[in-house]
Structure formats: structure tokens, C-alpha cells
Curated annotation (Swiss-Prot):
This is CalliFMRFamide-10. The modification Phenylalanine amide is found at residue 9. The keyword Secreted applies. The keyword Magnesium does not apply. Transmembrane segments: none annotated. GO terms for biological process: neuropeptide signaling pathway. It comes from Calliphora vomitoria (Blue bottle fly). Its main location: secreted. Belongs to the FARP (FMRFamide related peptide) family. One of its GO terms (cellular component) is extracellular region.
Amino acid sequence: TPNRDFMRF
């Protein structure tokens, strides 16, 4: 999910 992409930070 795209929401997980924000956790890449």
C-alpha cells in the first residue's frame, strides 16, 4: 500500500 511508502522515511 502507498501508506507503507511513507514509512520509508
